[in-house]
């Protein structure tokens, strides 16, 4: 059923109490709402368009963090675990370019930092009380900026060297995922090859044997962006060969305690012509053995991206055609196979400095989540939760950035049933709206409630009017705006005017709603994004 708004009088003058944005100067009062700033919405709520995973919003740890395994110990931070736990349920993908340059060495000795970490965990519940010894944490955090530069330089120069990691490294990674309530997906090295370019599975077998001995519950991938192996390693692997490699890995898993483990792939890059061709031949050869098709997407080159790019609906819409291409390939080869966005962020190459870690990045992130759900992608994995570059959710001091808070709100408010919302009229692209059933795990809400999330790329406030019969319902507003003089480039965020920050290392803040007067329009300030929960909506598709 398509539900349309009924005309009503424009809302009265509203005071913007949350600080200036866009054309409004400090202390200026906004002008009264003009007719063109009142926007009517249409909802389709008769049945869900799609059903996404409860782990729809998931995260990654880049494999380059293990280049020097000492830095994996940073994952032992209780604060980092608290932040990760806030996003559960979710997958934690350990992957990235370095996946194909990491070799497991079960005989490798633990580093001093690793030994210190494990010794400090003796006789205590590591998930509750585990922490990094203060001297070790201080040392690693002092050295991290230099290590980060090394990793980024290696990435830019495309000169990758093999690194080894130990049993201890695997233990640290698994412990972080397990204590955080995340399901680990581990990327195996696909560039280990025999003389005739068959995949050499011997190192993977060593890792499987070790993880099996520990009773670890892990899902698996093989390789990262195989479409660029020639550029990265001077090795060309076609899609058919890669499909055979996945069949070989599938057989290995079936012979081990991982016989019921999930296998995902092939983690190709953006679906340009050659990559789409590779994906098609891979799916024909090996698509039967994978549980979901994975691919990667970035909007921009991190070294050339601008703030204007982050706010440009033309840039946001590029994602739509990429999704369509992937689904065309999948439906022509393995119809019905689930599609995941296995790695994604705003800009490749580690993100865009002074942009990918600011409030401005949220426009891309929220829009990508909305479009992905609407178009049928089951899981979206955000690059990265913590690590090198500028696109992380949590910074080098373990402090959450704006996209973390946006992700946390999404987790708490947005359910798995995807509905349809649209803006009436022709000028829709700068005001982007998405609709789901509300997350019923949220104790504040109940089955039948709706969550609308909206992005305003206009330089004026827009007033959203809900369609009948929702126009007179109680609505809770969760408006996110940047804090401080840097505006859209701020790394701090306010929710309904209150600054979001952790209470302490073990405690996330309450996410306080702002109840709106029933029947009022939903004000969305210039260059902002917000969630609106429509209470007592009693939508049958959500029950």
From Swiss-Prot:
Signal peptide annotation: 1-35
Keyword Hydrolase assigned: yes
EC identifiers of the protein: 3.2.1.166
Reaction(s) catalysed by this chain's protein: endohydrolysis of (1->4)-beta-D-glycosidic bonds of heparan sulfate chains in heparan sulfate proteoglycan
Residues that make up the propeptide removed upon maturation: 110-157
Activity regulation text: Inhibited by EDTA, laminarin sulfate and, to a lower extent, by heparin and sulfamin and activated by calcium and magnesium.
SS bonds (residue pairs): 127-179, 437-542
Stated consequence of mutating residue 534 to D: Abolishes processing, secretion and enzyme activity
Quaternary structure and partners: Heterodimer; heterodimer formation between the 8 kDa and the 50 kDa subunits is required for enzyme activity. Interacts with TF; the interaction, inhibited by heparin, enhances the generation of activated factor X and activates coagulation. Interacts with HRG; the interaction is enhanced at acidic pH, partially inhibits binding of HPSE to cell surface receptors and modulates its enzymatic activity. Interacts with SDC1; the interaction enhances the shedding of SDC1. Interacts with HPSE2.
Role description: Endoglycosidase that cleaves heparan sulfate proteoglycans (HSPGs) into heparan sulfate side chains and core proteoglycans. Participates in extracellular matrix (ECM) degradation and remodeling. Selectively cleaves the linkage between a glucuronic acid unit and an N-sulfo glucosamine unit carrying either a 3-O-sulfo or a 6-O-sulfo group. Can also cleave the linkage between a glucuronic acid unit and an N-sulfo glucosamine unit carrying a 2-O-sulfo group, but not linkages between a glucuronic acid unit and a 2-O-sulfated iduronic acid moiety.
Name this protein carries in UniProt: Heparanase
